[in-house]
């Protein structure tokens, strides 16, 4: 699994011009699933995301977690994180998980985030979405469970 985490001051996602999810301070997560990902990948990511200390404390140091600042998460499915651009000019997405599998894993990822005590808003898997966000920092972090092992 791959997750691009962006620290935001606000974010929202629209589908068919209707707001599907919105948050204030927190994270936007772009979530990509590959075939072969498993619950251990989800557990690793949720633990890292939940405990990550990238919000500033009173001294201005990145020392507070999303839970410490009562932040929320906007989770967006993003198969294009697995784009292969080695050949030609049109990316290939064959490394992305099959939609049936990726949907289950994406939903399980969000459920596990919620079970950890975090507020999670989502887009809709496979939908054409318009995501708006205001980066805070900016702070952007890439997680890849295959390179973490």
Curated annotation (Swiss-Prot):
Compartment(s) where it occurs, according to its Swiss-Prot or TrEMBL record: Cytoplasm
EC number from the UniProt entry: 3.1.1.96
Motif (Gly-cisPro motif, important for rejection of L-amino acids): 137-138
Molecular-function annotations in GO: D-tyrosyl-tRNA(Tyr) deacylase activity; Gly-tRNA(Ala) deacylase activity; Ser(Gly)-tRNA(Ala) hydrolase activity; tRNA binding
Alphabetical UniProt keywords: Cytoplasm, Hydrolase, RNA-binding, tRNA-binding
Cellular component GO terms, alphabetical: cytoplasm
Superkingdom of source: Bacteria
Biological process terms in GO annotation: D-amino acid catabolic process
Family: Belongs to the DTD family.
Biological function: An aminoacyl-tRNA editing enzyme that deacylates mischarged D-aminoacyl-tRNAs. Also deacylates mischarged glycyl-tRNA(Ala), protecting cells against glycine mischarging by AlaRS. Acts via tRNA-based rather than protein-based catalysis; rejects L-amino acids rather than detecting D-amino acids in the active site. By recycling D-aminoacyl-tRNA to D-amino acids and free tRNA molecules, this enzyme counteracts the toxicity associated with the formation of D-aminoacyl-tRNA entities in vivo and helps enforce protein L-homochirality.
The protein, known as: D-aminoacyl-tRNA deacylase
Organism annotation: Leuconostoc mesenteroides subsp. mesenteroides (strain ATCC 8293 / DSM 20343 / BCRC 11652 / CCM 1803 / JCM 6124 / NCDO 523 / NBRC 100496 / NCIMB 8023 / NCTC 12954 / NRRL B-1118 / 37Y)
């Amino acid at each position: 699994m791959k997750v691009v985490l962006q620290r935001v001051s606000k974010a929202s996602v629209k589908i068919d011009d209707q707001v599907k999810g919105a948050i204030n301070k927190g994270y936007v997560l772009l979530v990509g699933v590959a075939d072969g990902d498993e619950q251990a990948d989800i557990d690793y990511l949720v633990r890292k995301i939940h405990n990550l200390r990238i919000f500033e404390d009173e001294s201005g140091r990145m020392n507070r977690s999303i839970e410490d600042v009562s932040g929320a998460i906007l989770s967006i499915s993003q198969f294009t994180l697995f784009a292969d651009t080695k050949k030609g000019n049109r990316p290939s997405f064959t490394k992305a998980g099959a939609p049936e599998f990726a949907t289950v894993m994406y939903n399980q990822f969000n459920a596990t985030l919620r079970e950890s005590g975090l507020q999670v808003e989502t887009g809709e898997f496979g939908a054409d979405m318009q995501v708006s966000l205001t980066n805070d920092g900016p702070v952007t972090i890439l997680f890849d469970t295959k390179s973490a092992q």
